[in-house]
UniProtKB/Swiss-Prot annotation:
One of its GO terms (biological process) is methylation. This is Uncharacterized 37.1 kDa protein in transposon TN4556. Belongs to the methyltransferase superfamily. The keyword Transit peptide does not apply.
Length: 345
């Protein structure tokens, strides 16, 4: 750990009152998840004392407690306010409504990239019937309608009444598009009635991905195409000097935020089990160099707060993580898999 980091940890540990060396380290571990080595701890104390940011108190037995000086407390408060303002300017803490989030996500470079690959792989043709499983607010229904026009049809299905209403409003001038309220696990469609289908970041959220794929297989005609795009959240990497903190964040996303956090790596196997052939798997890695752009997709601050509440990250470590990410330079990456499946006769 860098000396400046060690000094700031010592200042934070002393914020609530005087402590001696062992107790300082215990307080540091409680808020950051780590202890300082003896050299780092006592070196930090010596430097802080030289800067008149801490001062020793009268020894109690063999223990020598330290406390913050007024200058040390002022510095600690100034740093905390400064970094909180910085991370607050970069990251959004409020949870956006689902429609706004999906609309915002669709405009990102990452989404445009993989959606283009999915559309090419689906190869929807004029006159075909195309199914969008979990269509959301209708983001991709217009594109599908254009691909199957003039005589084809597009069916969007979603389990959310709000999403269905949004999708219907957005496609009311597209007569080829139908939007239905339905459960991906029990589709309201006849066997073999669909030529091609897609599912876009939906299977990561459903209760039973295997059942959803079995239903997709049922409604597709023999030879029909299913294209799926799903992230593998265990592939999420975020550059941070303390690797354990970034790993803990990724574990929390995979374990708690996303129901099926590693669905991306499972898609090909699940499709084969459901009776599909799987001719193509395309990995697409989205790289983020801008913290605000990454926050649109990853929800860094709100999910960090959840990680603290769930016990995956200590509070101080999480704030330092957000401060570091906000200050930059920033790097994050996550891999999404586009899997092309074909219904076997």
């Amino acid at each position: 750990m860098r000396t400046n980091d060690a000094q700031m940890l010592v200042l934070c540990a002393l914020a609530d009152g005087p402590l001696h060396g062992y107790a300082i380290n215990a307080a540091i571990e409680q808020v950051s998840g780590h202890r300082l080595g003896p050299g780092s701890l006592y070196g930090a104390l010596a430097r802080l004392e030289a800067k008149q940011l801490v001062r020793p108190l009268e020894e109690k037995g063999r223990q020598r407690p330290f406390c913050l000086t007024p200058a040390g407390r002022e510095l600690l408060e100034r740093e905390a306010h400064s970094m909180a303002r910085l991370s607050g300017r970069v990251f959004e803490s409020a949870v956006p409504d689902e429609v706004s989030y999906l609309d915002q996500l669709a405009t990102t470079d990452a989404a445009r990239s993989y959606k283009s690959v999915m559309l090419d792989a689906l190869d929807a043709r004029p006159g075909e019937s195309a199914l969008d499983l979990g269509c959301g607010p209708g983001t991709d229904l217009g594109t599908l309608a254009k691909a199957v026009s003039p005589s084809g049809r597009v069916i969007g299905i979603d389990s959310s009444q709000e999403m269905v209403e949004q999708a219907r409003r957005r496609t009311e001038n597209l007569p080829a598009v139908e939007v239905e309220l339905g459960d991906i696990h029990t589709l309201p469609l006849e066997d073999g009635s669909i030529d091609c289908a897609r599912t876009d970041r939906v299977l990561q959220h459903v209760a039973d991905p295997a059942q959803a794929l079995a239903e997709a297989r049922r409604v597709l005609r023999p030879g029909g195409r299913l294209v799926m795009g799903e992230p593998d959240w265990d592939s999420l990497t975020i550059d941070y000097p303390d690797l354990e903190v970034s790993r803990a964040y990724t574990r929390h996303v995979t374990d708690k935020i996303v129901r099926n956090g590693v669905i991306g790596r499972q898609l090909a196997r699940l499709a084969l089990d459901a009776g599909f052939a799987v001719p193509t798997v395309v990995p697409i890695t989205s790289v983020f160099r801008d913290a605000q752009a990454a926050d649109q997709v990853l929800g860094l601050q709100r999910n960090t707060e959840r990680a603290v509440s769930a016990g995956y990250l200590p509070a101080l470590a999480s704030q330092r993580w957000l401060d570091h990410l906000a200050a930059g330079p920033f790097f994050a990456a996550v891999t999404l898999y586009v899997v092309v499946a074909q219904a076997t006769p």
